[in-house]
Amino acid sequence: MIRSATVLLLLLIAPAYTQPVAVAGFDPHLVTNVYATALAFMVPRTLEPVPVSQLTLWGLHGLTALDPNLITDIKDGKLRLLTHGNLVIERPPLSDTDIDGWAAMASDFAAAAVASSTVVRHAGTQGVVQSFFDELFNHLDPYSRYVAPSDAYEDRERRVGSAGAGLQLVQRGSTILVGSAVSDGPGALAGIRPGDAIISIDGRTVQGKGATAVAQMIAGPEQTTVIVGWRTRDGRVRSAEIERSMVPPETVYAQRAGEMLLVQVTEFNRSTAAHLSRAIEEGLANPHPPEGIVLDLRGNRGGLVRQAVEAADMLLPAGVVAITAGRDPEASRIWRSARGELAGTIPVVVLVDGRTASAAEILAAALADRGRGVVLGSSTLGKGLVQTISPLPDGGELFITWSRVLAPRGWPIQGLGVLPQVCASLGPESLVRQLAELAEGRDPMAPAVTAERALRAPLAPAQVLAIRNACPAAEGRDSDLEAARALIHDPATYAAALLPPLRDRSETTSVVSSPSLISAPKDH
């Protein structure tokens, strides 16, 4: 929750401290650029408007977090930094339109703190920047954050991939094995399969090297080539020249489980929807097609919202998938399905648990609200806020929450989460009773599910707790799959758990109050 504060922007007095002291290990120019880029990105996009002066003052409290002897305050219309009660630097506040000026001032204060404090000096440039954002984001929502350069690189790899062969390597003793291969990655297309052993890269043996080192040998600039030698599981030695490409990690794992097609989606990166579509198409093309699809979203923490919308698109007829609302025009939109139903009317059961979050909740809520799937498991995490990302000059990234998500029936996902139609977290006996009642046409979860769908933001904590207590969040269990099998095997039980479908636009547009939301989604 954003806390208000008053900032005096009155006096135009020459600064008492005009030039930051150059200190080894601290780069004031980089810090200025990072702050300026971040503040310019945040000011028009935060969920609630916050002036740049307030954002900067919050961030400067990071100096106190590093060294409690450093205090930032406002006195006589001037912003001051003190140590042990002694003035270190003071400046007149600036106009809230001067974002670059506030960034430069914050950098000057940081440089003065570095010169005055051994603790801050030891933290260095990265420590000062990290502390600035840590303190700033303490005043915003739980999901807005700064990601340092080292972690940002890993985050980007998860979202968009890295240039390589699309292979995940593992070490078994002295052997480097392929743990998994992205199905449409260059390695898999060259014939490399899980379980094969990598033996050479560009003619150099990998003997004595670990999996990470071998992965680094395979990686390189996009559209360059690497020669990979490997030994297949049946002992044949093969070699191929592979062109490196950007390959996101695999997120979709499909297998036949009796009469069901079980599809696990671990997160949503830029290839998830395409891989999910292929998995469903291949599963349905089997000479003995499955009786139903089980979409396993347990433990899925989310990812790219557009990918979740595209995943919903392949299972839903035309209509609303989700509604997002924010201050930036690009943040407010109605996300729609349009492509048609890839799986026809085949039953769909969606497995969720207390770790299912964000984009995964959007997909689960859409399938449930539109009467296309039965959600089974426990209450999900309840992360109904969407972040937009900006790269920063230090190589880090800024994640800013810029919109709230509403499900197709108009209820907010944030805080509530998705309440399943079949609750598996109340124990095995309760689950058996629910399935038996559904088989007789009675839906024991209907009152709670209906109550959730009727809620509108903002919500009181008591409302949230009352809904979530109907099916407390928990980790998924093996019995979830057996319950899904029971739903798919008995059409009457499955039908009793379904919500009635939203049949036309009028049933969803009533939840939208802002004209800016009535627009088709645009690509990022």
Regions found by a protein language model. Give the residues of each.
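Terminal targeting/pro-maturation regions of precursor/exported proteins
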Residues: 11-147, 290, 448-524
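Conserved PDZ fold ligand-binding element
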Residues: 40-45, 113, 187-210, 293-296
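PDZ/PDZ-like groove recognition
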Residues: 59-63, 162-182, 187, 194, ...
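PDZ-domain C-terminal substructure recognizer with occasional recognition of PDZ-binding tails
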Residues: 139-140, 174-177, 199, 213-253, ...
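PDZ/PDZ-like peptide-tail recognition elements
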Residues: 131-133, 138-180
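Short flexible coil/turn linkers enriched for glycine and charged/polar residues
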Residues: 159-163, 171-175, 192-193, 220-224, ...
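A short glycine-leucine-enriched loop at secondary-structure breakpoints
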Residues: 186-197, 219-221, 288, 366
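C-terminal "post-core" interaction segments
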Residues: 25-39, 253-524
